Amino acid sequence: MSFMEALKDLRSEIDSLDRELIQLFAKRLELVSQVGKVKHQHGLPIYAPEREIAMLQARRLEAEKAGISADLIEDVLRRFMRESYANENQFGFKTINSDIHKIVIVGGYGKLGGLFARYLRASGYPISILDREDWAVAESILANADVVIVSVPINLTLETIERLKPYLTENMLLADLTSVKREPLAKMLEVHTGAVLGLHPMFGADIASMAKQVVVRCDGRFPERYEWLLEQIQIWGAKIYQTNATEHDHNMTYIQALRHFSTFANGLHLSKQPINLANLLALSSPIYRLELAMIGRLFAQDAELYADIIMDKSENLAVIETLKQTYDEALTFFENNDRQGFIDAFHKVRDWFGDYSEQFLKESRQLLQQANDLKQG
């Protein structure tokens, strides 16, 4: 037998095993769907962290005993779990508050508003949408609403909340999904005498599942009246993080405004350079390709949204100005050929990150491996 024939036979066996794997995958997903039905019936969150950790630890040990890479098995299982979380959505979720007969989402045809509309419908709540062309009939849309959720662009949020004022009754819950919280929360408390809740989903509308996602909670008024909504969101798999509006907005200056500005500036700078993007990609290491992907991803989205996030408040500009100063400071190391100064600064930053440095190194290594797997050619 020639080596090509031997290779063909081995590949044929591998193909056969792959087909068996597909059947096993299908069986596992079917079992997961049954789990989803049970969770739906009993109102259990789709994400159970303790179960996930215990299962992964057990499978890693079993893999090592079998002489298989534990990381390989964990990678496969995590991909399965991600698929499983998305599949569990199709069975819907338990209705936490059966006394809620009408929820109105202002801006519910938008991306994020539409996402919450789908999840709330899947949880058994009747949903009505008030869109920008509907204000002439706002009274009828908002009549008898139990909950009103505002999900509009940042620059329209305060105006929209003000326009709702004539239609709000004390028994209603008024909430918003805006990525800034201090001014919207204050405006809701001003126009409404009933329950008020500020929410900030820390994810985009393109997620496949809310499992492991974070939703920030900023209390407004009468929290006992909206605990059911927070519990509902947790059943979807999300984690609720509680903070106050001022602290939230301060943190968002760094999490959103500074990061988005830096990404925008990097993209703007690259676009002005005498380079060919295709050539950069062909020569890229996995980490640089991932960085390029993060930059390019920004420019595939809504420019108005990012303009609003970056320009939202004066604190953002002040912090961005300090970034400019830090760039100038860092540049002096190289202008002065100050190698030791650079090394000293490097070590100071490493000390600031502390143990997170090693944690981020491990996490980024996994991301880079996945990014390299997706590389074409």
Curated annotation (Swiss-Prot):
Q: Could you confirm whether the keyword NAD appears in this record?
A: yes
Instruction: Give the record's keywords alphabetically.
Output: Amino-acid biosynthesis, Aromatic amino acid biosynthesis, Cytoplasm, Isomerase, Multifunctional enzyme, NAD, Oxidoreductase, Tyrosine biosynthesis
Tell me which EC number(s) this protein carries.
5.4.99.5, 1.3.1.12
Q: Which InterPro entries match?
A: 6-PGluconate_DH-like_C_sf, Chor_mut/prephenate_DH_T, Chorismate_II_sf, CM_dom_sf, CM_II_prokaryot, CM_T, NAD(P)-bd_dom_sf, PDH_C
Domain Prephenate/arogenate dehydrogenase span(s) in chain numbering: 101-364
Q: Which reaction does it catalyse?
A: chorismate = prephenate; prephenate + NAD(+) = 3-(4-hydroxyphenyl)pyruvate + CO2 + NADH
**Pathway involvement?**
Amino-acid biosynthesis; L-tyrosine biosynthesis; (4-hydroxyphenyl)pyruvate from prephenate (NAD(+) route): step 1/1; Metabolic intermediate biosynthesis; prephenate biosynthesis; prephenate from chorismate: step 1/1
- PROSITE patterns per the record? CHORISMATE_MUT_2 (PS51168), PDH_ADH (PS51176)
A cellular component term from Gene Ontology for this protein is: cytoplasm
Annotated GO biological process:
chorismate metabolic process; tyrosine biosynthetic process
The record's GO molecular-function terms, alphabetically, read:
chorismate mutase activity; NAD+ binding; prephenate dehydrogenase (NAD+) activity; prephenate dehydrogenase (NADP+) activity
Report the leader peptide range: none
Q: Specify the Chorismate mutase domain's residue ranges.
A: 1-92
Report the superkingdom from the record: Bacteria
Q: Where in the cell is it found?
A: Cytoplasm
Family (UniProt)? In the C-terminal section; belongs to the prephenate/arogenate dehydrogenase family.
User: Would you tell me the protein name for this molecule?
Assistant: T-protein
Instruction: Give the species.
Output: Haemophilus influenzae (strain ATCC 51907 / DSM 11121 / KW20 / Rd)
